[in-house]
Amino acid sequence: MGFPLSAIEPGDVTIRQAMPEDAAIMVRFLRELAEYQATTEYFHATEEAILRDGFGENREFEALIAVSEGKPVGLATFNRTYSTWEGSVGLVIQDLFVAEEARGKQVGFHLVRDVARIAEERGATHLQLNVVHANPARNFYARVGFNHMDDLLTYRLSHDKMTALLDL
């Protein structure tokens, strides 16, 4: 990937592109994120899905891993999006997780900054994310510069309701 890796403090934490061998830790971090947000009922990720969709022939997402002392301590997953209203490409951060022992050490900031760097290199005009209402990281997102868009609500059609819709 053509972006410089972040080094938070020399020898402390670096950000790198995720690799297939990170699939297990990615699933663990995603599960911990779901637990942190009290949304485990929605969590169904598997290593197989991560490998297929993050590293397969038709990649659906990309990921960055934060590493400290040789150990993964953070994860950012993101994918491309398009705004027809703006007529421009953007990136959306799907997941941002920092292990408890690494919180407060700017790991999340550097993960977001490197996703922003990738977005800029690719000509994206915006970076967005969706946040669970109860997520205490909302304050962090505001400090980084994300704006809460009061006029937008997210609606989701679950798979069972989607297939039921097809029968109408």
Spans of model-derived segments:
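A short beta-loop-alpha structural element at the N-terminal edge
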Residues: 14-28
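A short, internal acetyl-CoA/4′-phosphopantetheine-binding micro-motif in the GNAT/acyltransferase core
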Residues: 96-103
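Conserved GNAT acetyl-CoA-binding A-motif
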Residues: 119-130
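Conserved beta-strand in the GNAT
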Residues: 65, 71-80
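Conserved active-site alpha-helix within GNAT-family acetyltransferase domains
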Residues: 109, 121, 133-151, 157
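Conserved GNAT-fold acetyl-CoA-binding loop/helix
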Residues: 27-52
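A short helix-loop-beta-strand connector motif used in the catalytic cores of GNAT acetyltransferases and
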Residues: 54-65, 92
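Conserved acetyl-CoA-binding loop-helix of GNAT-fold acetyltransferases
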Residues: 104-117, 143
